[in-house]
Amino acid sequence: MSYFRRRLSPIKPGEPIDYKDVDLLRKFVTERGKILPRRITGLTSQQQRELTLAIKRSRIVALLPFINAEG
């Protein structure tokens, strides 16, 4: 039987997630521009919701692309 090590949250609880912090947001987006799921990011459910909103806002303001077509 294998055991999985619990991932520590990369963002501290209570730390604000800002849509203008593009470097932070890119860590949670795939090469193709998709938002990574919570089981991979290791965030809490509230942090994941805030992150999703921040990424979507950032896309609307054109800080992040909707689709990364480089590949």
Curated annotation (Swiss-Prot):
PROSITE patterns under this entry? RIBOSOMAL_S18
Q: Which InterPro entries match?
A: Ribosomal_bS18, Ribosomal_bS18_CS, Ribosomal_bS18_sf
The UniProt keyword set, sorted, is: Ribonucleoprotein, Ribosomal protein, RNA-binding, rRNA-binding
Would you tell me the Gene Ontology cellular component terms? cytosolic small ribosomal subunit
What biological process terms from GO does the record include? translation
- Asked whether the keyword rRNA-binding is assigned, the reply is yes
What Pfam families has UniProt attached to this entry?
Ribosomal_S18
What is a GO molecular function of this protein? structural constituent of ribosome
Its subunit composition reads:
Part of the 30S ribosomal subunit. Forms a tight heterodimer with protein bS6.
| Protein family membership | Belongs to the bacterial ribosomal protein bS18 family.
| Known role | Binds as a heterodimer with protein bS6 to the central domain of the 16S rRNA, where it helps stabilize the platform of the 30S subunit.
Q: Which named protein is this? A: Small ribosomal subunit protein bS18
